[in-house]
Amino acid sequence: MTFQVIFQVEGTPVPKGRPRFARRGKFVSTYSPKTTVDYESKVSDAAKLAMGSQKPLEGPIVACIYITLPIPASYSKKRLKACLSGEERPIKRSDIDNFCKAIFDGMNGIVFEDDSQVVSLHATKVYGTVGMVEIMVQEHLL
């Protein structure tokens, strides 16, 4: 029997931001943007709750990520209807891989030891009335 964990992260998904650089004299340090750090923490909290006392998975992993972005308030009723029916998809805002990076970084050490264990990934980005992410992670069957 394979272990499987399914959980949701409520709120508008945040893509992984580019690292920032700060110069302190001769030294340059890098840091992640606050929005990225906060979102990764939110994912970590949801993952900890879903995992309970289960240890992080150690073998190959399969992940499915369903990203729901809120429909922009500026959209017309016609466009809103198209978004909710799936006719229009979010193609303007952020690459899907940047959302996945932030989600995987939030799950590191909790759901799995390291995101390099992910051997199969299915990610979908859609519009919805509220923003959220649904995540399913399971051991890969050989």
At which residue positions do the language-model features occur?
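Acidic, proline/glycine-enriched N-terminal capping motif
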Residues: 1-142
